Amino acid sequence: MKPLYIYFLAASLACTSCSDSWLDLNPSTSVPTDQAFSSLEDAQSALNGIYRLASAHSYYGDNFFYFGDCRAADVQARMTKGDGRRVSPYYEYNVKATDSFNSSLPWNQVYKVIRQTNNLIAATESGLIKTTDEAALNEIKAQALAMRGLALYDLIRVFAMPYSYDNGQSLGVPIVTTATDQSSKPARNTVAECYDQIITDLTNSLAGLSKEKKDGCLNYWAVQGILSRVYLNKLDYPNAYKAATDVIENSKSLYQLYTRDEYPTVWGKEYTSESLFEFYFSLTEPSGGSGGEGAPMVYANEEKVDWNNLILSEDYLNLLNEDPQDVRHCVTEVSAIANNEGLPE
């Protein structure tokens, strides 16, 4: 294969945004005990920390996207030296348990998110948080529930067989719904049990979530959108249709599909009209933190050492070229690296 184009703007950028005002409360990435919570501000700070953990390099900031993008048919890896091979283990289906960067790192990071959501949920139910604004506290709890459901959904998509393989009877990942020590090693649940828990968390969160658009935060419509995808993966088509239709029909005042003219320009913007939910990524913080540098840069079309790792496959380009008017032509361009360096023969 000799692909000629590279992604100009990664689809993963769809999860990039949030204004600085969203982080006015100091985000915390570690809330070890219920004693850390005594006010609504403490709870909000902990929730901010959960979103920050999810946007980190080893989750939505980088590694998580490799599992899907690199193992599918639309792109292929450029086999360059050094960190440029960050994507090749996924592309070659050669991710090993001993490879901490590619296996234990994303696993551990997602469970950090789950652990912090459990701490926050327990705190909201403990009575230790003193506030007169119960609605605000309930919404914080609802967002934590939704984030726990999303995190478990992400784990099951990466580390388990699809539900369709055997109707969910294969082993999935451990379900953790209580505040446990990070050294605990719970047993794995089945895929079906995991989907039941995901749906329970997401569904239970809906009643407490706002239907207003909240930049950088989950709201009712975002969770309904996630639920529709969960049901689709579970082969529950009636409920997938019901959840998706709710969003499409009842959120028109907040969200609109991109026009053809808008499409090429939206990927570098925050809070666009079609986006139900976007994570905040810092453009200045190193990618090992909440910086979103990692995922976009593997698609970046530039001659930078150890980046520019993924390019469009020939099959994808052939399909794209069947329609010269396809709007996706506007976000692809010829690779900056000469002679297709690093491509497999």
Predicted feature locations:
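Short, surface-exposed recognition loops and adjoining beta-strand edges that mediate ligand/DNA contacts
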Residues: 34, 61-82, 155, 160-169, ...
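Short coil/linker segments at helix-helix boundaries
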Residues: 133-135, 158-192, 196
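Sec-dependent bacterial lipoprotein signal peptides
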Residues: 1-16
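Inward-facing hydrophobic residues that define packing positions of alpha-helical scaffold repeats
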Residues: 47, 114-117, 195, 202, ...
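Membrane-proximal, proline-rich intrinsically disordered regions
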Residues: 3, 18-69, 244, 307-309, ...
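Hydrophobic-face positions in mid-chain alpha helices that act as interaction patches
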Residues: 45, 241-345
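Conserved, well-structured interaction surfaces
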Residues: 85-159, 189, 207-211
